Amino acid sequence: AKVGGIHANNTYPAEFIYENLMIQTNIIHNAFLNGVKKLLFLGSSCIYPKYANQPIKEDELLTGKLEPTNEPYAVSKIAGIKMCESYNRQYGKSHNIDYRCIMPTSLYGQGDNYHSENSHVIPALIRRFHEGKINNASSVSIWGSGKPKRDFLYVDDLASSAIHVLNLEKKIYDKHTTQMNSHINVGSGVEITIKKLAESIKEVVGYKGQINFDLKKLEGSPRKLVDNQRLNSLGWKAKIKLKEGLTKTYNDFIINKCLV
C-alpha cells in the first residue's frame, strides 16, 4: 500500500487513491484468477468516520463523513474491504475462497519510513527529535495542538494478529463477522494524546530541548481508538507496550541510519 502521514495524504490525494486502488484491485482479482483460496487484506482505521462513536466498533463503517485529509486513502481501503466481501459473496461457495480483512490502527516499528514530513507521526517525531538532539536545537516543532488521541500498534503485534486471524477456522471467523461487515479491528487498546506521545519519544531519544506545538498545522481526527472486542473474543491481544516499541523503533532508526 501507499501510506503516509497527514502532510503526505493532504498533498498527494490523487496518488493515494489511484495507487492503492490499483494495487489492491490487481492483487485481489489476480489472486482469485490464480486459485488463491485464502487471502488477508490489510485496511486501516482511517476507514471510519471522523466523528465515529468511540471506541470505534466495526459497524461504524460508512456511518458518517471521513476525515478530509485522508479521505482518498480511506475510500481506497473501504473499496478493498468491499471487494473482498463481494468476492466472498459471489465466489465463496462455488470456488471455495475465503478473503478476510483486518483494520489496524496507527502502526509503527522497525523498517518504517522516517521522512520528517511525509511519514506517520511516530517515525517523523523520532527523526525530528534525533536531529534536534545532534544539532543541539532549542526546540522541536509538532503539528497541531497535541490534543488528538490515538491508539498505536507495534508492527510485531500486527504480524501476530494477521497470522492469528488468517489461521482461524472459517466457521469461527464467520460466527464473529457478517457478509457485509466482515472486517476485524486490530489495536493496542490503549490511547494516548499526541502531546504525551511526543514527550515519550523525546525521552526515548534523549532530546533535552522544548516542544513547540504549531497550531496552524493540520492534526486530523480528534480521537481514534478502535474497539478490539471482536478480535479479543477470538483469542488475541497486543503484547508490546508503547515505551518498549518506541525504544525498539528508535534503535532501528539508529542502526540503519534512516536519514533519507
Segments (PLM) and residue ranges:
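N-terminal Rossmann-like NAD(P)+-binding domain of SDR-like oxidoreductases, especially those catalyzing
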Residues: 1-113, 248, 255, 259-260
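Mobile, glycine-enriched helix-loop/loop "lid" segments at the mouths of ligand-binding/catalytic clefts
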Residues: 46-55, 119, 124-133
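Short, flexible, glycine-rich and Lys/Arg-enriched loop motifs at helix boundaries
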Residues: 53-55, 59-69, 129-142, 146
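Conserved active-site region of classical short-chain dehydrogenase/reductase
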Residues: 21, 25-29, 82, 123, ...
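C-terminal substrate-binding subdomain of Rossmann-fold SDR/epimerase-dehydratase oxidoreductases
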Residues: 125, 131-260
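Short, solvent-exposed loop/turn segments at secondary-structure boundaries
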Residues: 112-117, 153
